[in-house]
Amino acid sequence: MTDVIDDGGIASEVRAKIGQAVRAKLDRNPMVSRIDAPGLEIYGRHHFLDMQECAALRALIDADAQPSTLFSGSANADYRTSHSCNLSPWDPLVTQISDRICALTGLPPENGETLQGQRYATGQEYKAHCDYFPVTASYWPAMMKTGGQRSWTAMIYLSPVEAGGETHFPHCEFMVPPVEGMILIWNNMQPDGAPNPLSIHAARPVEKGTKYVVTKWFRERRWCA
Protein backbone atom coordinates (compact mmCIF):
# COMPACT_ATOMS: atom_id res chain seq x y z
CA MET A 1 0.00 0.00 0.00
CA THR A 2 1.30 3.45 -0.91
CA ASP A 3 1.06 5.92 1.96
CA VAL A 4 0.62 9.34 0.32
CA ILE A 5 -0.67 12.24 2.38
CA ASP A 6 -3.22 13.94 0.16
CA ASP A 7 -3.02 17.26 2.04
CA GLY A 8 -3.03 19.50 -1.02
CA GLY A 9 -6.65 19.04 -2.02
CA ILE A 10 -8.41 19.62 1.29
CA ALA A 11 -8.81 22.40 3.84
CA SER A 12 -5.58 23.40 5.55
CA GLU A 13 -5.07 25.55 8.63
CA VAL A 14 -1.61 26.51 7.36
CA ARG A 15 -2.90 27.73 3.99
CA ALA A 16 -5.89 29.40 5.63
CA LYS A 17 -3.55 31.41 7.88
CA ILE A 18 -1.42 32.38 4.88
CA GLY A 19 -4.55 33.67 3.18
CA GLN A 20 -5.62 35.63 6.25
CA ALA A 21 -2.23 37.32 6.58
CA VAL A 22 -1.96 38.33 2.92
CA ARG A 23 -5.57 39.48 2.81
CA ALA A 24 -5.07 41.71 5.85
CA LYS A 25 -1.89 43.24 4.43
CA LEU A 26 -3.40 43.98 1.02
CA ASP A 27 -6.63 45.33 2.51
CA ARG A 28 -4.59 47.84 4.56
CA ASN A 29 -2.69 49.13 1.54
CA PRO A 30 -4.35 52.24 0.02
CA MET A 31 -2.51 51.64 -3.26
CA VAL A 32 -4.13 48.21 -3.70
CA SER A 33 -7.73 47.63 -4.78
CA ARG A 34 -9.72 44.47 -4.28
CA ILE A 35 -11.47 43.38 -7.47
CA ASP A 36 -15.13 42.45 -7.11
CA ALA A 37 -15.16 38.74 -7.89
CA PRO A 38 -17.55 36.70 -5.71
CA GLY A 39 -15.83 33.62 -4.35
CA LEU A 40 -12.33 34.72 -5.38
CA GLU A 41 -9.77 36.90 -3.60
CA ILE A 42 -8.05 39.01 -6.25
CA TYR A 43 -6.33 42.38 -5.95
CA GLY A 44 -4.77 44.86 -8.33
CA ARG A 45 -2.34 47.76 -8.12
CA HIS A 46 -1.56 50.11 -10.99
CA HIS A 47 1.98 51.48 -11.57
CA PHE A 48 3.66 48.72 -9.58
CA LEU A 49 6.48 48.88 -12.15
CA ASP A 50 7.50 51.89 -14.22
CA MET A 51 7.98 51.88 -17.99
CA GLN A 52 11.76 51.47 -17.76
CA GLU A 53 11.47 48.44 -15.50
CA CYS A 54 8.89 46.89 -17.80
CA ALA A 55 11.13 47.47 -20.83
CA ALA A 56 14.11 45.90 -19.06
CA LEU A 57 12.10 42.82 -18.16
CA ARG A 58 10.79 42.50 -21.71
CA ALA A 59 14.39 42.48 -22.92
CA LEU A 60 15.27 39.69 -20.48
CA ILE A 61 12.32 37.65 -21.71
CA ASP A 62 13.21 38.21 -25.36
CA ALA A 63 16.76 37.03 -24.68
CA ASP A 64 15.77 33.64 -23.23
CA ALA A 65 12.16 32.81 -24.15
CA GLN A 66 11.44 29.34 -25.49
CA PRO A 67 8.14 27.70 -26.52
CA SER A 68 6.10 27.23 -23.36
CA THR A 69 5.38 23.82 -21.89
CA LEU A 70 2.75 22.65 -19.43
CA PHE A 71 3.76 22.04 -15.81
CA SER A 72 3.98 18.32 -16.50
CA GLY A 73 6.84 19.18 -18.86
CA SER A 74 4.96 18.43 -22.05
CA ALA A 75 4.37 20.84 -24.91
CA ASN A 76 0.86 21.32 -26.26
CA ALA A 77 0.52 23.15 -29.55
CA ASP A 78 -3.08 24.12 -28.87
CA TYR A 79 -3.32 24.63 -25.11
CA ARG A 80 -0.39 26.93 -24.34
CA THR A 81 1.10 28.70 -27.32
CA SER A 82 3.22 31.40 -25.69
CA HIS A 83 6.97 31.62 -25.15
CA SER A 84 8.37 31.71 -21.62
CA CYS A 85 11.50 31.50 -19.48
CA ASN A 86 12.59 31.53 -15.88
CA LEU A 87 14.41 34.78 -15.12
CA SER A 88 17.75 34.59 -13.38
CA PRO A 89 17.33 35.11 -9.61
CA TRP A 90 20.85 36.60 -9.62
CA ASP A 91 19.87 39.44 -11.94
CA PRO A 92 19.66 42.60 -9.77
CA LEU A 93 16.40 43.78 -11.36
CA VAL A 94 14.76 40.36 -10.99
CA THR A 95 15.85 40.19 -7.35
CA GLN A 96 14.56 43.69 -6.67
CA ILE A 97 11.16 43.00 -8.21
CA SER A 98 10.79 39.68 -6.41
CA ASP A 99 11.59 41.46 -3.14
CA ARG A 100 8.99 44.13 -3.89
CA ILE A 101 6.33 41.50 -4.56
CA CYS A 102 7.16 39.88 -1.23
CA ALA A 103 7.03 43.25 0.54
CA LEU A 104 3.64 44.01 -1.02
CA THR A 105 2.09 40.68 -0.06
CA GLY A 106 3.99 39.88 3.11
CA LEU A 107 4.79 36.43 1.74
CA PRO A 108 8.21 34.99 2.67
CA PRO A 109 10.83 35.24 -0.10
CA GLU A 110 11.88 31.65 0.55
CA ASN A 111 8.38 30.44 -0.39
CA GLY A 112 8.49 32.13 -3.80
CA GLU A 113 9.30 30.29 -6.99
CA THR A 114 11.60 31.78 -9.60
CA LEU A 115 10.08 34.74 -11.43
CA GLN A 116 8.86 33.51 -14.83
CA GLY A 117 8.50 35.66 -17.94
CA GLN A 118 5.94 35.00 -20.67
CA ARG A 119 5.48 36.48 -24.13
CA TYR A 120 2.34 36.20 -26.26
CA ALA A 121 2.41 37.21 -29.92
CA THR A 122 -0.73 37.82 -31.95
CA GLY A 123 -2.94 34.74 -31.80
CA GLN A 124 -1.14 33.14 -28.86
CA GLU A 125 -2.93 32.15 -25.65
CA TYR A 126 -2.96 29.92 -22.58
CA LYS A 127 -6.30 28.19 -22.17
CA ALA A 128 -8.10 27.82 -18.83
CA HIS A 129 -5.89 26.31 -16.15
CA CYS A 130 -5.28 26.39 -12.41
CA ASP A 131 -2.09 27.51 -10.69
CA TYR A 132 -2.61 25.20 -7.71
CA PHE A 133 -1.52 21.60 -8.12
CA PRO A 134 -4.22 18.96 -8.71
CA VAL A 135 -3.49 16.24 -6.16
CA THR A 136 -4.39 13.61 -8.75
CA ALA A 137 -1.55 14.75 -11.03
CA SER A 138 1.44 12.46 -11.41
CA TYR A 139 3.77 15.25 -10.26
CA TRP A 140 1.91 16.01 -7.01
CA PRO A 141 4.07 13.77 -4.74
CA ALA A 142 7.16 15.61 -6.00
CA MET A 143 5.50 19.00 -5.40
CA MET A 144 4.69 17.98 -1.82
CA LYS A 145 8.43 17.58 -1.25
CA THR A 146 9.41 20.90 -2.85
CA GLY A 147 7.14 23.27 -0.92
CA GLY A 148 3.61 21.92 -1.19
CA GLN A 149 0.68 23.74 -2.73
CA ARG A 150 0.83 27.05 -4.52
CA SER A 151 -1.00 29.50 -2.30
CA TRP A 152 -0.89 32.91 -4.04
CA THR A 153 -0.06 34.09 -7.55
CA ALA A 154 1.39 37.51 -8.43
CA MET A 155 1.40 38.53 -12.10
CA ILE A 156 2.60 41.80 -13.63
CA TYR A 157 1.66 43.12 -17.06
CA LEU A 158 4.76 44.46 -18.83
CA SER A 159 3.27 45.87 -22.02
CA PRO A 160 0.15 47.51 -23.39
CA VAL A 161 -1.75 45.33 -25.86
CA GLU A 162 -3.75 46.90 -28.65
CA ALA A 163 -6.46 44.21 -28.54
CA GLY A 164 -7.06 40.96 -26.66
CA GLY A 165 -4.73 39.31 -24.16
CA GLU A 166 -7.03 39.66 -21.15
CA THR A 167 -6.66 37.46 -18.08
CA HIS A 168 -10.02 35.69 -17.98
CA PHE A 169 -11.52 34.05 -14.90
CA PRO A 170 -14.35 32.10 -16.57
CA HIS A 171 -16.07 30.84 -13.42
CA CYS A 172 -16.26 34.40 -12.07
CA GLU A 173 -17.22 35.82 -15.47
CA PHE A 174 -14.74 38.69 -15.54
CA MET A 175 -11.57 39.65 -17.40
CA VAL A 176 -8.66 41.97 -16.61
CA PRO A 177 -7.13 43.68 -19.66
CA PRO A 178 -3.35 44.19 -19.85
CA VAL A 179 -2.21 47.51 -18.36
CA GLU A 180 1.54 48.11 -18.43
CA GLY A 181 3.04 48.06 -14.93
CA MET A 182 -0.09 46.70 -13.20
CA ILE A 183 0.20 43.80 -10.78
CA LEU A 184 -2.57 41.27 -10.15
CA ILE A 185 -2.47 39.15 -6.99
CA TRP A 186 -4.90 36.33 -6.28
CA ASN A 187 -5.40 33.56 -3.77
CA ASN A 188 -5.50 30.09 -5.31
CA MET A 189 -7.08 28.78 -2.10
CA GLN A 190 -10.48 29.17 -0.49
CA PRO A 191 -10.69 30.80 2.96
CA ASP A 192 -10.39 27.36 4.59
CA GLY A 193 -7.17 26.63 2.69
CA ALA A 194 -8.59 24.18 0.16
CA PRO A 195 -7.92 24.77 -3.56
CA ASN A 196 -10.36 27.22 -5.12
CA PRO A 197 -11.65 26.18 -8.57
CA LEU A 198 -12.85 29.76 -9.08
CA SER A 199 -9.18 30.72 -9.46
CA ILE A 200 -9.03 28.87 -12.79
CA HIS A 201 -8.03 31.42 -15.41
CA ALA A 202 -6.91 31.80 -19.01
CA ALA A 203 -4.71 34.13 -21.01
CA ARG A 204 -7.03 35.17 -23.81
CA PRO A 205 -5.61 35.23 -27.35
CA VAL A 206 -3.76 38.41 -28.28
CA GLU A 207 -5.61 39.98 -31.19
CA LYS A 208 -3.17 42.79 -31.93
CA GLY A 209 0.22 43.56 -30.44
CA THR A 210 2.48 41.56 -28.11
CA LYS A 211 1.75 40.78 -24.48
CA TYR A 212 4.50 40.37 -21.88
CA VAL A 213 3.99 39.33 -18.26
CA VAL A 214 6.02 38.07 -15.34
CA THR A 215 4.53 35.67 -12.82
CA LYS A 216 5.61 34.63 -9.35
CA TRP A 217 3.99 31.71 -7.57
CA PHE A 218 4.23 31.17 -3.82
CA ARG A 219 4.24 27.81 -2.07
CA GLU A 220 2.80 27.09 1.35
CA ARG A 221 6.28 26.17 2.61
CA ARG A 222 9.88 26.94 1.63
CA TRP A 223 10.32 26.26 -2.07
CA CYS A 224 13.06 23.79 -2.97
CA ALA A 225 13.78 23.75 -6.70
Describe every region a protein language model picked out.
Residues 1-185, 189-225:
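Fe(II)/2-oxoglutarate oxygenase catalytic core
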